[in-house]
């Protein structure tokens, strides 16, 4: 019924959020690599830019871990809504 529908919707939302976060992590990884390259090979980039890029990447990676947890929790909730055993 409604509980299964809600649990399934929550799972799909968590799945989409994780996919978007994975893209964000990839983009920030690329940005960090480019920033490090510019820092090492030019005089146009400060070390602060490298640190900022690292901080952004680490923050996104932490958010990705939280998104993965939310997806697992949503899967458990869906399993339980379908009549599975409680954990």
Task: Outline where the language-model segments fall.
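Amphipathic alpha-helical coiled-coil segments
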Residues: 1-63, 70-81
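Terminal intrinsically disordered/low-complexity segments used for targeting and assembly
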Residues: 82-87
